[in-house]
Amino acid sequence: MSITAAQVKELRELSGAGMMDCKAALAETNGDMEAAVDWLRKKGIAKADKKAGRTAAEGLIGVVSQDLSAVLVEINSETDFVARNDVFQDIVRNVATAALGTEGSIDAVCASFYPGSEKTVEATIKDAIATIGENMTFRRSAKLSVEDGVVATYIHNSVAEGLGKLGVLVAIETTGNKKAAAAFGRQVAMHIAATNPLALTAEDVDSSAIEREKAIFSEQARQSGKPENIIEKMVEGRMRKFFEEVVLLSQAFVMNPDITVDAALKDAEKSIGAPAKITAFIRFALGEGVEKEESDFAAEVAAAAKG
């Protein structure tokens, strides 16, 4: 099949590999992007990307918290100019506020009443599109709650209160001091913003992701030419490293890299004054998995794609 310049560009962004390596990988895998990333990794050309997905959309992430709950919403716009508009920012805040009164799914939020209005969130967004003159999309919504404890929040590089390009929620169950729990929770949320973990615990990592990593590590190890029993130990070691990199509680804590997040939680229990448990987290980065149409492309990539 013919490999396009856009495919080469996308694979370069996903893998960090060179142009010609990306073109070869796409040719070997018939243009299958995920398979091409794996092909590059097996060759030792590309590193694992912990969460596939390109960030290409404009808009804002909004966060609102109240009592024992907090929500994240993502609303996309066509341009950053509109995202910096006060009207658009108010819409994101109000949609997040509306989400607090629901179970958090996008359907439930769309059907709920927009704050201070008799119209639904969905109808209000449609009206705003006509007013602003640019399309906007309510892309996703998520809510975390605790029975007793806190849901800490963090917005990275906020453009206004509760609004930015990346947002995180962290649920901590504890009967202890809520102020201390919230302070630690914010540190964990900042850590999550920086490290983008796949899961809370090793048991939470998707089995297909584990099998994929094992297959790639096995292929890499076999290229060493070592005996099968040595290869098995090499794979076990690389899988341990994989879990340390992608499991939140096993990651080195950004605030103190000498200890894990789990160990930091144990330390935090001293100031919290009671046992504490991180039960869930959610991380929204603006435009994850969304692509914009590219109207222009680098000449050397186009030349490479042509052959």
From Swiss-Prot:
CDD domains: UBA_EF-Ts. InterPro entries: EF-Ts_dimer_sf, Transl_elong_EFTs/EF1B, Transl_elong_EFTs/EF1B_dimer, Transl_elong_Ts_CS, UBA-like_sf. Its main location: cytoplasm. PROSITE patterns: EF_TS_2. GO terms for cellular component: cytoplasm. It holds the Pfam family EF_TS. It is found in: Cytoplasm. Keywords: Cytoplasm, Elongation factor, Protein biosynthesis. PANTHER family: ELONGATION FACTOR TS, ELONGATION FACTOR TS, MITOCHONDRIAL. Associates with the EF-Tu.GDP complex and induces the exchange of GDP to GTP. It remains bound to the aminoacyl-tRNA.EF-Tu.GTP complex up to the GTP hydrolysis stage on the ribosome. NCBIfam families: tsf. This is Elongation factor Ts. It comes from Bartonella henselae (strain ATCC 49882 / DSM 28221 / CCUG 30454 / Houston 1) (Rochalimaea henselae). The gene is tsf.
